[in-house]
Amino acid sequence: MFRPAAVLVTIMADEATVLLTKRSSALKHHPGQVAFPGGKVDPGDRGAVGAALREAEEEVGLRQDSVEVLGTLSPHLTVTGFEVTPVIAFAHGAFAPRPEAGEVEEAFFVPFDHVTDPAHFRIEARRWRGVMRRYYAVPWGPYYTWGATARMLRGLADRLARCD
């Protein structure tokens, strides 16, 4: 059974960028990986949207009242047992992330047009728990975004392509 989780895909409307984080190297799960702010849906959350907003505020200081939720993408099942719902939101105005040291090593912004252009994605493979797995990757500068986060970005790119 998959555990419910959610991430906030924050589009900085004024700068046309997407907020990403580099997870702390001290974390048990996915240390040092690039990810959206997010985490498990807690009993007190208002579903996936509430969890994504709460986690973004905890991890990078993005106030819940400073974003406009646009909707969600289809949930993604991860090899680590989570059903992750990407929550898409606009943030208006300036925002200076304040990474929570225990969870986030760094917060940064990637150009929206880079992570929503299918031409920037590639499919790679690596062995995980004895099984060869294929996954999306979308590198940008010094950042290597892969796996579930890249798959969610690719899902957003594909959704936008259908809107054209």
Task: Label each residue range with its predicted role.
Residues 10, 149-156:
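Buried hydrophobic packing segments
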Residues 15-22, 97-99, 146-147:
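Short, well-ordered strand-loop elements centered on a beta-strand within folded domains, enriched
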Residues 1-36:
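N-terminal strand-loop-strand
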Residues 40-141, 145, 154-164:
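Unchanged
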